[in-house]
Amino acid sequence: MSDTTNDRLDVLAVGPHPDDLEITCGGTLAKLVRQGYRVGLLDLTSGEPTPRGTEELRAREAEAARQVLGVPLRLNAGLPNRELMDVPANRYVLATLFRRLRPSVVLSVAGRTPAASPDHHQAHLLIEAARFWSQLTKWDDRFGDTRPFRVPHLVYAPFPFDAEVRHWHSTFVLDITDTFAQKLAAIRCYASQFDEARFAKVSHFVTGHAIATGSRCGFAYGELFALPHPVGASDLHALVHGGKGSPAPVPLPQDPAQPPQ
């Protein structure tokens, strides 16, 4: 991909392992594609080693999930799983990718997950740092001779099992009622990580979280996002009302065991 305006991504979602983006924001990614935005996925590591996975199998699963979500581009940064750290060498790799892909929005996983991989929190820190480094001048030789680029917008997709209750500057919820089934189907692609018994537990948790998140805004299913700054607006009515027309009717939540068709 070149760095011309026509090739730039609208949204680049970045996570540490294949399956993290599907769990945190899979419904929104599928919705962005349906809305006509240019979307890319970037896994920082292969996710291996794991007890039942291999590099080749995880790559096939990630590709299958990409197809389910309808996202046209999925890349892997090749950083080490289990040892992912926010260190200068990794910042160079990720900042170089930001310079090459030149996204308008970087969608970053966020949160501390002590019951799961520490890679999750390190990815959060690394993405923030690489976003800053990607704009630095007089260092082009450290970024593969790519041109400096500042990612205009950073949006957090918090892990639903974050260990902390965070006080973000701003949060909002995306309605994923029409893409929730795609989200679950994409997660199910990772059979090496989620056998039938474990997928049933993950599906139950993800479904319950999406219902609880969406219900706060009148949606059947929702995904939470956060910003590192307050929301700016010039029209209070449009901001809270969603436009000048009458709001669309809100669908009622379905049975958690029955995702929308």
Predicted features along the sequence, with ranges:
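Active-site rim/loop-helix segments in enzyme catalytic domains that contact anionic ligands
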Residues: M1-R102, A238-L239, G243-G245
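Metal-dependent de-N-acetylase/amidase catalytic core
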Residues: S2-L12, P88-Q261
